[in-house]
Amino acid sequence: MGIFDDVNNWEKTEGAKIISSIIDVADPVILDYGCGAGNYSFAAAYAFDQKCKVYAVDINRQCLDYISEKAKSEKIGCIDAVEGREDYRQDFDSDTFDLVIYADMFHGEEKIYGGFHRFIMIEEAKRTLKKGGTLAVLPFHLSNFRDKDRKKSKYTYKKLIDEITEYGFAYIDNELQGIHFEKVYSPYYQQKGGITFESLERGKLLIFEK
């Protein structure tokens, strides 16, 4: 069994279990922002047996085409692949979502905000989440963050939690871990070889309630 089979199996089993443990809502509306290949979108679809609506948002058209084709082949009709905006704002109404997922999105120095994009994303999560809704943040590359002085800074989970709670979110401690799927789809790592599902990076999933 290859790594893509392992990933598909994770989406249907462990990934689905993680999503269903985060929220207990009938027919939830979910945003997977910066979705990449849609691993967490598919996990959400399986978590609720497609009795949900999932918006998989990314600025990469190739990712969205991949998600649409995969959803079609797996007969999943609850996922909408939506092209995102480069300014990290969301074209959704306020109080729309039961769950917002930000996986591997907060690090780096993007061209518009110089590394401050995560603050825009937190603001947008607060706006678009329903009251009592859940924000799930899966941060990686913690040594490649920008602090509020725009200086490169090594972050900790606690420092990031403190930042997010300043926006009025309540942190919910848990033992959940997510997976960093970047290497699965990276041409560089595919060419390099040697990537196994077991070798993929795991990280703490930070859960907040609006």
Spans of features found by a protein language model:
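Conserved alpha-helix/loop element of class I SAM-dependent methyltransferases that forms part
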Residues: 9-28, 43
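Conserved class I S-adenosyl-L-methionine
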Residues: 27-36
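Class I SAM-dependent methyltransferase SAM/SAH-binding core
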Residues: 31, 42-89
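A short acidic, Gly/Pro-enriched loop at the edge of an enzyme's catalytic core
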Residues: 90-100
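A short SAM/SAH-binding and catalytic strip from SAM-dependent methyltransferases
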Residues: 98-117
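A short glycine-rich, Lys/Arg-flanked "PGG" loop and its adjoining helix->strand segment in the class I
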Residues: 116-131
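Conserved beta-strand signature within the Rossmann-like core of class I S-adenosyl-L-methionine
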Residues: 132-139
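Class I S-adenosyl-L-methionine
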Residues: 169-210
